[in-house]
Amino acid sequence: MSRSKVFFDITIGGKASGRIVMELYDDVVPKTAGNFRALCTGENGIGKSGKPLHFKGSKFHRIIPNFMIQGGDFTRGNGTGGESIYGEKFPDENFKEKHTGPGVLSMANAGPNTNGSQFFLCTVKTEWLDGKHVVFGRVVEGLDVVKAVESNGSQSGKPVKDCMIADCGQLKA
């Protein structure tokens, strides 16, 4: 099975700041990767929340330097919302992949089996998250853009400037 590639075009403080390209582990966690891919394309239309199931126009609401950048709450924009293509939440698929370093793409959650649409991109190795968060992809291009977003974070997680996913989608194989 070939792995899907998806992208985010990022703006920081309203300025175009580059593209992040991610490879998804469709072969390891097909349900988790499939959810993220569909949220990048917006192909599933409107969700139960009444909002489009799409990352486009959403922001990185939690950015902690030397840790990670978190986004994917397209329903409320503050970390309390989000929705998967399967309905609200879905189970942890497996923990085969680990949080090995910068660029790891993983699901944010509120405890076991609470995956929705929120995700994070690691900016360092975060091994303490292994077995708690489902890793489902990695950055293959644009780690510098991830770092640019990270530089707009704070210890509280509140971003200094708005860091948005201005556009997103799937790249052809």
Swiss-Prot record:
GO biological process entries: protein folding
Highest taxon of source: Eukaryota
Reaction equation(s) it catalyzes: [protein]-peptidylproline (omega=180) = [protein]-peptidylproline (omega=0)
Pfam families from the UniProt entry: Pro_isomerase
GO CC annotation: cytoplasm
EC number: 5.2.1.8
Reported function: Catalyzes the cis-trans isomerization of proline imidic peptide bonds in oligopeptides. Plays a role in protein folding, transport and assembly.
Name the UniProt record assigns to this protein: Peptidyl-prolyl cis-trans isomerase 3
Annotated organism of origin: Caenorhabditis elegans
Source organism phylogeny: Eukaryota, Metazoa, Ecdysozoa, Nematoda, Chromadorea
Gene from which the chain derives: cyn-3
